[in-house]
Amino acid sequence: MTFYLSGFRSIPKLWKSNPYFELGPATSSTPFFLCAIGNQQRWFSVKPTTPPNSKALNLLDTKARTHRKGNDNNGQVSSDPHYFAAGAAKKRSHIGANPQNQGHALPVRSSVQLPTKPLNSAEWDKLKEDFKGKASFEDFIISQMARNCCSVDVAKSLLAWVAAKNNGIVGYNLLVKYLYLCVFHKQTSEVIDVYEIMKAKYKSLESGGYTLLIRGLIHSDRWRESLLLLEDIKKVMVPSKKNYGDCIQGALLHQDVNTAWNLYQELIGHNLIPPLETLKAFFDYGKDINDDHYSDKLLDILLYLRNNQLYPGESFAHSIKTWFESIPGRQWKGQFTTIQKSGQCSGCGRTIEPIHLSPEEYEFLKEKIMRDVIDGGDQYKKTTPQELKRFESFVNSCPPFDIVIDGLNVAKMFPKGRESQNLLGVVSQLAQQNLQLLVLGRKHMLRPSSQWRKEEMEQVRKQAHCFFADNISEDDPFLLYATLNSGNHCKFITKDLLRDHKACLPDARTQRLFFKWQQGHQLAIMKGFQKSKLTFQHILSYDTVVQRTGDSWHIPYDEDLVQRSSCEVPTKWLCLQRKTPDPC
């Protein structure tokens, strides 16, 4: 699509030179817009050739130092975080990485260097003449500019050159990428100029264009027009949580609280998870008002975080603390702390909710797992119904197990040892404790080879119940069935974090119960395991969710520089205590 610059506001006004606003943090703005637009067209596929800004470099350098410090302690068993601690998976992946493969990535080079200042027509002609790429020069340059968040003035000089060469015509793609830069640099007046052109030329836009305009308009006195754009999106699809989040923040910025809450309820009604920065905005706004109804809604947000096992970031946690401490007459006091292994808060001494499921929760989860995971069907095409039936009969013929072992997984935990020897070492030590053991394996483990000694596997079978599935079968359905069928006391050993099984559960409550059960039942062998002594990492005794106990709140939060996977939980907490009771 194309449009003519002439006819829509004067060219001098459109390309006026304004000093742009202070650059926002690249880590928050860039990924959002590239993802939002990338779903429509692959506009931002070219990798940057210029260095990232110094703030980003400093952040990456800090992260690198943090990881190096964490890896220096890998030999110390006492310093290991628990298996589900935030950042633990990242550390394990670093440990398992091959250092010979690191540092050999080839830099991506383009045939032109992005300009750092606006160019005139002759300079753009020369740059295009030097361009050797197969792609369109104009598309390549504007994509590079968007990826590197270049100056709006430089991008403006590109579009002015294109317009001069094409009788005032600039392609839609160039315009939208220019809009991206205007939004990123918070050039509100430029956003409005582009908005006027698009509104006059097009009856509707693709979702990426709407997303950019909404985010760009919310900071202006024309922010309500972002709500009209949201309505345009609703005509063809459910707006994204980012679209809703931006409109909510616009309403709060302009003190329209009712609109903000209405949009929030609409977002929740679509079963969308609100962006955490949107929830943070509600707390930031709340510290300036004294309204019990508003306060109740903020407490509902905390319960929403609990029910959906969501964790605020560090900045959000500070906003929550500030809001609590700003409530007049309540004398809330917050502190950032940790939870001891016993489950006691290091700040206030209160005991956090236990990780163990109640009998009712356990039976509910067991029924769901049996129905949606074990008998789910399609996601386990490699496991036949006949084999599952054979396994069920086998389990029912055995006494309840104390520990279920993923045999192949455990055998491969220690690369220096023979696999059958590794498995035998673990089984032998557990058997000495008179535990009922089940080893799950594959049939190839029974065929003698350099890794699987016949005599060692015979010793395994003497000390534990064993079930060997077909070589193409999935292990996990068997492991889950045997563990849950044996009762709430039964634990299991595997390095697999069972992400896929959690994901296939039907609702947030079941997924949360599954993760809670997993944290309380999955045993992780220490990295420093010696064949003569088997040691497990401690299992968390407490549940890592937002929780309220009388006159206190405990809120786990994500640290800024810790990369947490979806199967991990934060290790830092916000502890809030109230010195005076609620008024009657």
Swiss-Prot record:
| Cofactor binding note of this UniProt entry | Binds 2 Mg(2+) or Mg(2+) ions per subunit.
Q: Name one Pfam family in it.
A: PRORP
> Reaction(s) catalyzed by this protein?
Endonucleolytic cleavage of RNA, removing 5'-extranucleotides from tRNA precursor
**CDD domains recorded:** PIN_PRORP
**Which residues of this UniProt protein bind Mg(2+) 1?**
D406, D475
Q: Where in the cell is it found?
A: Mitochondrion
> Which cysteines are disulphide-bonded?
none
Q: What is its EC number?
A: 3.1.26.5
> So which cofactors does this thing need?
Mg(2+); Mn(2+)
Q: Could you tell me one molecular function GO term of this UniProt entry?
A: metal ion binding
Q: Which residues bind Zn(2+)?
A: C345, C348, H554, C575
Instruction: Write the record's keywords in alphabetical order, separated by commas.
Output: Hydrolase, Magnesium, Manganese, Metal-binding, Mitochondrion, Nuclease, Transit peptide, tRNA processing, Zinc
Q: Name one GO biological process term.
A: mitochondrial tRNA 5'-end processing
Q: Outline the extent of the PRORP domain.
A: 339-575
Positions bound to Mg(2+) 2: D476, D496
Tissues/organs with expression: Detected, after the onset of hearing, in the organ of Corti around the afferent and efferent synapses of the inner hair cells and the efferent synapses of the outer hair cells.
Q: Does the keyword Transit peptide apply?
A: yes
Membrane-crossing residues? none
Asked if the keyword rRNA-binding belongs to this entry, the reply reads no
**Entry's InterPro entries?**
MRPP3_PIN_dom (IPR033495), PRORP_C (IPR031595), TPR-like_helical_dom_sf (IPR011990)
> What does the annotation say about its assembly with partners?
Catalytic component of mitochondrial ribonuclease P, a complex composed of TRMT10C/MRPP1, HSD17B10/MRPP2 and PRORP/MRPP3.
Function in brief = Catalytic ribonuclease component of mitochondrial ribonuclease P, a complex composed of TRMT10C/MRPP1, HSD17B10/MRPP2 and PRORP, which cleaves tRNA molecules in their 5'-ends. The presence of TRMT10C/MRPP1, HSD17B10/MRPP2 is required to catalyze tRNA molecules in their 5'-ends.
Q: What is this protein called?
A: Mitochondrial ribonuclease P catalytic subunit
Origin organism of this chain? Mus musculus
